Amino acid sequence: MTEQYFAKQPSAESRPVETEFTYRGHTLRLMTDSGVFSRGSVDEGSALLLESLPELKGRVLDLGCGAGVIGVCVGKVNSIELTQSDVNRRALALTEENLKRNDVSGTVIESDGFAARMKGRQL
Protein backbone atom coordinates (compact mmCIF):
# COMPACT_ATOMS: atom_id res chain seq x y z
CA MET A 1 0.00 0.00 0.00
CA THR A 2 1.26 3.47 -0.84
CA GLU A 3 2.09 5.66 2.13
CA GLN A 4 -0.33 8.52 2.73
CA TYR A 5 0.73 12.16 2.95
CA PHE A 6 -0.49 12.38 6.53
CA ALA A 7 2.24 10.10 7.90
CA LYS A 8 4.12 11.96 10.62
CA GLN A 9 7.47 10.58 9.42
CA PRO A 10 7.29 9.53 5.75
CA SER A 11 9.10 6.27 5.06
CA ALA A 12 9.58 7.11 1.36
CA GLU A 13 13.19 7.89 0.53
CA SER A 14 13.76 11.64 0.47
CA ARG A 15 14.34 12.82 -3.11
CA PRO A 16 13.99 16.62 -3.06
CA VAL A 17 13.42 18.43 -6.32
CA GLU A 18 13.05 22.13 -7.10
CA THR A 19 10.26 23.51 -9.25
CA GLU A 20 9.26 27.01 -10.32
CA PHE A 21 5.74 28.40 -10.32
CA THR A 22 4.64 31.85 -11.43
CA TYR A 23 1.83 33.39 -9.40
CA ARG A 24 0.48 36.86 -10.12
CA GLY A 25 3.73 38.01 -11.68
CA HIS A 26 6.05 36.45 -9.08
CA THR A 27 8.20 33.47 -10.02
CA LEU A 28 8.52 31.31 -6.92
CA ARG A 29 11.18 28.66 -6.41
CA LEU A 30 9.74 25.76 -4.47
CA MET A 31 11.25 22.60 -3.05
CA THR A 32 9.16 19.42 -3.11
CA ASP A 33 9.96 15.88 -2.01
CA SER A 34 8.78 12.28 -1.88
CA GLY A 35 6.18 11.58 0.79
CA VAL A 36 4.72 15.08 0.40
CA PHE A 37 1.79 16.02 -1.84
CA SER A 38 2.55 16.91 -5.47
CA ARG A 39 6.26 16.19 -5.71
CA GLY A 40 7.95 17.89 -8.65
CA SER A 41 5.31 20.42 -9.67
CA VAL A 42 2.30 22.42 -8.57
CA ASP A 43 -0.74 20.22 -9.23
CA GLU A 44 -3.61 21.44 -11.40
CA GLY A 45 -6.05 21.63 -8.49
CA SER A 46 -3.77 23.88 -6.44
CA ALA A 47 -3.07 26.07 -9.47
CA LEU A 48 -6.82 26.43 -10.10
CA LEU A 49 -7.48 27.26 -6.45
CA LEU A 50 -4.76 29.92 -6.47
CA GLU A 51 -6.07 31.39 -9.71
CA SER A 52 -9.55 31.79 -8.22
CA LEU A 53 -8.58 33.34 -4.88
CA PRO A 54 -9.54 36.95 -4.17
CA GLU A 55 -7.24 39.36 -2.36
CA LEU A 56 -6.73 38.07 1.18
CA LYS A 57 -6.33 40.07 4.40
CA GLY A 58 -5.90 39.30 8.07
CA ARG A 59 -5.17 35.82 9.37
CA VAL A 60 -4.85 32.95 6.90
CA LEU A 61 -4.47 29.27 7.79
CA ASP A 62 -3.05 26.81 5.27
CA LEU A 63 -4.19 23.56 6.92
CA GLY A 64 -2.57 20.42 5.53
CA CYS A 65 -0.04 22.68 3.83
CA GLY A 66 2.18 20.00 2.32
CA ALA A 67 5.26 21.77 0.94
CA GLY A 68 3.56 25.11 1.61
CA VAL A 69 2.84 26.03 -2.00
CA ILE A 70 -0.54 27.69 -1.48
CA GLY A 71 0.50 29.63 1.62
CA VAL A 72 3.77 30.79 0.07
CA CYS A 73 1.93 32.01 -3.02
CA VAL A 74 -0.77 33.93 -1.15
CA GLY A 75 1.77 35.26 1.35
CA LYS A 76 3.88 36.63 -1.48
CA VAL A 77 1.10 38.82 -2.90
CA ASN A 78 -1.07 39.65 0.15
CA SER A 79 -0.48 41.42 3.46
CA ILE A 80 -1.55 38.57 5.73
CA GLU A 81 -0.67 36.84 8.98
CA LEU A 82 0.09 33.38 7.60
CA THR A 83 0.02 30.14 9.57
CA GLN A 84 0.81 26.86 7.83
CA SER A 85 0.17 23.52 9.46
CA ASP A 86 0.66 19.86 8.63
CA VAL A 87 1.16 16.59 10.50
CA ASN A 88 3.95 15.49 8.09
CA ARG A 89 7.35 16.61 9.41
CA ARG A 90 8.99 16.45 5.98
CA ALA A 91 6.25 18.73 4.66
CA LEU A 92 6.85 21.19 7.50
CA ALA A 93 10.58 21.34 6.77
CA LEU A 94 9.82 22.01 3.10
CA THR A 95 7.30 24.70 4.05
CA GLU A 96 9.88 26.49 6.21
CA GLU A 97 12.44 26.29 3.41
CA ASN A 98 9.96 27.54 0.81
CA LEU A 99 8.98 30.51 2.98
CA LYS A 100 12.66 31.50 3.32
CA ARG A 101 13.51 30.92 -0.36
CA ASN A 102 10.71 33.22 -1.43
CA ASP A 103 11.03 35.88 1.29
CA VAL A 104 7.57 35.24 2.74
CA SER A 105 6.75 35.57 6.46
CA GLY A 106 4.77 32.86 8.16
CA THR A 107 4.47 30.57 11.15
CA VAL A 108 4.78 26.81 10.66
CA ILE A 109 3.07 24.52 13.18
CA GLU A 110 3.01 20.74 13.45
CA SER A 111 -0.65 19.87 13.96
CA ASP A 112 -3.35 17.51 12.79
CA GLY A 113 -5.77 20.45 12.67
CA PHE A 114 -7.45 20.22 16.05
CA ALA A 115 -7.75 23.61 17.75
CA ALA A 116 -6.17 22.40 20.99
CA ARG A 117 -3.02 21.61 19.07
CA MET A 118 -2.74 24.96 17.33
CA LYS A 119 -0.85 26.34 20.34
CA GLY A 120 -3.65 28.62 21.43
CA ARG A 121 -3.82 30.50 18.13
CA GLN A 122 -7.14 32.02 17.11
CA LEU A 123 -7.61 31.60 13.37
Question: Which residues does each PLM region occupy?
Answer:
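N-terminal auxiliary segments of SAM/dcSAM-dependent transferases
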Residues: M1-R24, G35
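Well-ordered beta-strand scaffold positions
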Residues: H26-L28
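Class I SAM-dependent methyltransferase Rossmann-like catalytic core
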Residues: T32-R39
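Short, glycine/acidic-enriched capping/hinge loops at junctions between secondary-structure elements
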Residues: S41-D43
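Conserved SAM/SAH cofactor-binding pocket of Class I
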Residues: G45-Q122
